[in-house]
Amino acid sequence: MIGLVGKKVGMTRIFTEDGVSIPVTVIEIEANRVTQVKDLANDGYRAVQVTTGAKKANRVTKPEAGHFAKAGVEAGRTLREFRLSEGEEFTVGQSISVEIFADVKKVDVTGTSKGKGFAGTVKRWNFRTQDATHGNSLSHRVPGSIGQNQTPGKVFKGKKMAGQLGNERVTVQSLDVVRVDAERNLLLVKGAVPGATGSDLIVKPAVKA
């Protein structure tokens, strides 16, 4: 089953009949319009390409304009591709709504996490700070040793050090689907998802469900 492209609206909570509070993220999934269908003969694999939302006419490039015109759909803010499994068929110009998640229990949500800029090891990797006193005057939040000796004589790749934190692709798996509101194009999932309010999200049925 394919996924859909949505937009993070924010977080709220809903109550069960027993009065239990469930934190939920509201994802707005407007109709995804099919712009291209790829097949084995021409592309070597089966996939469907979709767009959603709108884009100002003066922001659409000529190649994009031609691509959308060929598909006969309105220009959207993004293009995303989903692999097709056996038996799944879509046609160019078709609209796919949030209703495809009506019978789905869990989803995987992918987004771009909030960027935190250049961060030290304490914030980025949860390193312990060193002594505040007892003779320590300069090295309170420094990482400490980053290597060994003349052998190996280098810092190993992947060493946890200070650097860019956030602003990377993150997937949160197996979030419970709490509600599907087809009338308002909303999907409510339990818990938090990556990214800032208003950012694009990719929602797929959970691979581990």
Swiss-Prot record:
SS bond list: none
Record-listed N5-methylglutamine modification sites: Q150
Chain intervals for the UniProt region annotation (Disordered): 133-153
GO molecular function, one term: rRNA binding
Keywords: Methylation, Ribonucleoprotein, Ribosomal protein, RNA-binding, rRNA-binding
SUPFAM superfamilies the record matches: Translation proteins
One GO term (biological process): translation
Post-translational modification: Methylated by PrmB.
GO CC term (a single one): cytosolic large ribosomal subunit
Superkingdom field: Bacteria
Protein purpose: One of the primary rRNA binding proteins, it binds directly near the 3'-end of the 23S rRNA, where it nucleates assembly of the 50S subunit.
HAMAP family in the cross-refs: Ribosomal_uL3_B
Protein family membership: Belongs to the universal ribosomal protein uL3 family.
Subunit structure, interactors included: Part of the 50S ribosomal subunit. Forms a cluster with proteins L14 and L19.
Protein name: Large ribosomal subunit protein uL3
Organism name: Pectobacterium carotovorum subsp. carotovorum (strain PC1)
